[in-house]
Design a protein with these regions (language model features):
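Short beta-strand segments
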Residues: 8, 87-89, 118-119
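Active-site cofactor/cluster-binding pocket
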Residues: 67-83, 87-103, 107
Length: 217
């Protein structure tokens, strides 16, 4: 069986120890908060990150671009590995498209290696679960083609349904209008959302109050 490495995006929200333990390389979608840009080797502690958000800090994110993707993959290819990349939903980010472009660019330099990009249509821990299935299948001795095929066949079975406590971040991401965010905040509206079969973030409904939103889930 050909050697291969699983790669993904850090949007899978898995612990960094998990990546290290399972020898997974991840593409870092950098973010800027309070004027400081955070890169792969300068992660902020998650507790500190969310504390700053609650205090009003507004992070902005950047997708992994083609060159950054190729820089992550080249050492793996140089070591004789194929690559199975499990990408953040193409309905939420351009990172999957960047990965596909990078894979095509690298074909010329590494004609004997194979790079397979799977659009997970997932986000956050849904993507993390997607990755974990791939990891367990690899441990069970499945080859890259078997794993990629299974993931493509079953990816619509990974369901995301969730609620958020703050409408302002949905407004900043273009998910709701400013008027809806302001009014919803005033009357304590909590949306219930899901990720559809094309990987887009779609509202399922809305209720008043955090407790009711959790019951709705």
């Amino acid at each position: 069986m050909r050697n291969f490495v699983i790669t993904t995006d850090n949007t899978a929200d898995l612990p960094y120890d998990y990546y290290k333990k399972n020898q997974i390389e991840y593409l870092f979608l950098s973010y800027t908060m309070d004027g400081k840009n955070y890169q792969k080797n300068a992660e902020m502690d998650p507790g500190e990150f969310y504390r700053k958000m609650r205090q009003g800090s507004m992070p902005t994110t950047s997708q992994a671009n083609v060159e950054e993707t190729m820089e992550t993959w080249r050492p793996l290819l140089d070591e004789g590995n194929d690559i199975l990349h499990l990408a953040f939903s193409s309905g939420l980010s351009g990172s999957c498209n960047s990965a596909r472009i990078a894979a095509n660019e690298l074909k010329e330099s590494y004609p004997d290696r194979k790079i397979t990009v799977v659009d997970s249509l997932c986000a956050s821990l849904g993507e993390g679960l997607f990755v974990d299935y791939a990891v367990e299948m690899k441990k069970a001795g499945k080859d890259m083609e078997e794993i990629a095929g299974w993931l493509e066949e079953h990816k619509l079975n990974f369901c995301h349904v969730f609620t958020v406590d703050d409408l302002n971040h949905l407004y900043r991401g273009g998910r709701v209008s400013k008027a809806a965010a302001v009014l919803g905040t005033m009357i304590n509206i909590k949306p219930v959302l899901h990720v559809d079969n094309e990987g887009h973030l779609i509202p399922l409904g809305k209720v008043r109050g955090r407790k009711k939103s959790l019951i709705k889930l």
